[in-house]
Amino acid sequence: MKKKFISFNETNRFSKLTTSYLSQAESLHPFYGLFPSIENFKKQIELKKGSYSNNHRQILASTLKDQYNSISNSIAVQKNLSLLKNENTFTITTGHQLSLMTGPIYFLYKIVSTINLCKRLKQHYPNSNFVPIYWMASEDHDFEEVSSFRFENKNIRWPHQVEGAVGEMSLEKLQPVLDFFEQQLGSHANARNLKEIINHSYRISKTLSEATFRLVNILFGDYGLIVIEPQTPKLKELFKPILKEELSKGSSFSSAIKQIENLKRGFDPN
């Protein structure tokens, strides 16, 4: 198969800021640390070794193991859950909203890219372990962005009113939407496989978080992808000092404002 690669600039789909970053423009160097090239990960690994406490690591590993107690998981997932306890294990994390049926295709691209990066890093740095993580944005409140998906030029929407975190939404009223979608699929082999996936994710789950967790695990569990549900008391406890710092000093807000002003002065978007 012949492959043709198109540069980000040629697509005309990305901002000048994005393409300048990807081309490692010198004017942007002050605004980030290491560019994520394979070679730079060597230094990044050394930096991360000293920035994450073993206590936090053990809490994370224990919490994730608990989250998988009710989920059928693969040998690859079990292996990576155990590897998280080791100090020479590092995570590559992607995140996305709980889009219905995965929603836009970049939901899948993000996860595939994360898994592939872990494989490449393991080849280059065999003495370290790399675990792909999908962080569920279960606390997001924008239901409109996750409530629909497209299939064969049809926009299939979940007509539902909701307030609060989308991850906590009950799936009781989703069943008619699933029925309609399955009718559109037909009865061929791939359709039957997809219906089976729906049955083992959305049909048996009580909340959108649980369904998305199960769906992503079915699709990518064999590749060792770990799904993390952030709405967990143990993980929130680790977040307390950071939240306290932000509420009392506004550290990240102040830093972001300063960076934006510096960016305006030091980068020409035209």
PLM feature spans:
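N-terminal targeting/trafficking signals and adjacent low-complexity tails
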Residues: M1-S113, L117-N270
